[in-house]
């Protein structure tokens, strides 16, 4: 059995290309901002995403529900290229209460989450796949590493208020998430969702701040 497993692993690796940087550490080449997020590259090559602090608040005659929709309108940064089978590795940092995510195979490019008003029934987490990144966001039971709405990660895998490494394997019949070296979640995938598409980084709401570094991809043929 051990020899069979090793043989399968060897075949899998033989069809995988070398690791390549998905973010060059200098600018946003190869990426497309979606929504009103402010994306920049810091001096050390870290990718910083935040929302505009000078954004106009809603008018004073809005209802509570309209305000909630305004507050939670999303912003994203997507790869221009699309991918089907691959390994993705990156490190992320969120402040206390921060909420972000990684979209997989999202051919909608978050169209429904960034429009006015947003349609939260068709966000990337529901249209395609989203890997949750969550540093204690109030009321959200999906811990970091969860495949949102499909497979929940256990609590305690994330290092609070520090950099965390997440590794995602995307195959035809499985999505697998490893957070800080520990298995977080697995799911066989949903045949009703896209089989290929871009990769996206999320700014969940109008107060989100997130940082990313060492973003790499290994395409599997």
Regions found by a protein language model. Give the residues of each.
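Sec-dependent signal peptide recognition
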Residues: 1-7
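Hydrophobic h-region of N-terminal signal peptides that target proteins for export
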Residues: 7-16
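Carbohydrate-interacting regions of secretory-pathway proteins
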Residues: 17-221
